[in-house]
């Protein structure tokens, strides 16, 4: 049985991951973590996860920190960058593998994740859905096969998302840039306004929409004079991401220290 800690347990993703971990025959929930100031700290996880099998009751309560002697195999974190860094440091100290689904980390924060990976297995991904990860591959292939086409990326998420553009949109741009030998730091254009002038071929446009309760939509277009190829992924619910994160945690358990990707989990 794989022992799992969930960090960011009261968040939209955290709640669903709690349910999936408790409902999986191969995993058991050993801790659920939230910010110290969160009103649900001290409450049973049943207050967060309603869809749990009756034969797998849990006595776990939401806590701001794990017990000193807690035995665990993997911690799954979907929170905010500042918390994710603390979680990675905690995992390195305790010897737990860590799955990080938080996006919006800056360069310094990514370096701290890399430091944790020198001690434990660390898996980071901008998106844990199978379909989206296939889209990463398709975009790289299309960019390679369609040199000179104008590449534009449009992502849409719910009004509550804090970072923009999404980590998935940035990964799509990275894959397109890698496939065409471009330096994304020099060719990325984040939205347009005013009089930017004519579009240049090396540009990769990245645009973010925030509206309602959209779970996640990403469209990449490759356009030249006379035609457009459009590739789109739409998430219908957070289950696509939550199931992928739990699958990644099960795969990561027992792996040696190092940095891992969800593409490795999927074998693509």
Model-inferred region functions:
Residues 75-76:
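N-terminal Rossmann-like NAD(P) cofactor-binding module of classical short-chain dehydrogenase/reductase
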Residues 116-161:
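Hydrophobic, well-structured mid-protein blocks that either form specific transmembrane helices
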Residues 5-7, 12-69, 147-268:
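C-terminal substrate-binding/catalytic lobe of Rossmann-fold NAD(P)-dependent oxidoreductases
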Residues 2:
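Nucleotide donor/acceptor-binding cores
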Residues 72:
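An anion/phosphate-binding loop that grips the pyrophosphate of nucleotide cofactors and donors
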Residues 38-39, 105-108, 129-132, 160:
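Short gly/pro/ser/thr-enriched loop/turn and capping motifs at secondary-structure boundaries
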Residues 82-94, 101-122, 133-141:
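Rossmann-fold NAD(P)-binding glycine/threonine-rich loop
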Residues 79-80, 103, 208-210:
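Short glycine-/small-residue-rich Rossmann-like dinucleotide-binding loops
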């Amino acid at each position: 049985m794989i022992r799992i800690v969930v960090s960011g347990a009261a968040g939209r993703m955290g709640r669903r991951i709690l349910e999936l971990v408790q409902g999986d025959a191969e995993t058991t929930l050993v801790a659920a973590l939230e910010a110290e100031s969160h009103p649900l700290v001290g409450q049973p996880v049943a207050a967060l996860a309603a869809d749990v099998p009756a034969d797998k009751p849990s006595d776990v309560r939401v806590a701001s920190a794990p017990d000193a002697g807690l035995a665990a195999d993997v911690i799954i974190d979907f929170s905010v960058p500042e918390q994710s860094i603390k979680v990675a440091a905690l995992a390195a100290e305790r010897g737990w593998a860590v799955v990080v689904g938080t996006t919006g980390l800056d360069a310094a924060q990514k370096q701290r994740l890399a430091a944790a990976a020198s001690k434990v297995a660390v898996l980071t991904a901008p998106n844990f859905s199978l379909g989206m990860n296939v889209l990463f591959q398709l975009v790289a292939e299309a960019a390679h096969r369609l040199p000179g086409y104008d590449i534009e990326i449009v992502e849409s998420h719910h009004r509550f998302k804090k970072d923009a553009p999404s980590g998935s949109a940035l990964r799509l741009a990275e894959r397109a840039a890698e496939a065409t030998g471009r330096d994304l730091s020099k060719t990325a254009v984040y939205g347009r306004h005013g009089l930017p002038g004519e579009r240049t071929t090396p540009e990769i446009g990245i645009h973010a929409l925030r509206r309602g309760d959209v779970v996640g939509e990403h469209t990449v277009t490759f356009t030249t004079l006379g035609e457009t190829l459009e590739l789109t992924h739409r998430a219908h619910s957070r289950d696509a991401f939550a199931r992928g994160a739990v699958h990644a945690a099960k795969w990561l358990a027992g792996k040696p220290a190092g940095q891992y990707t969800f593409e490795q989990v999927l074998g693509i």
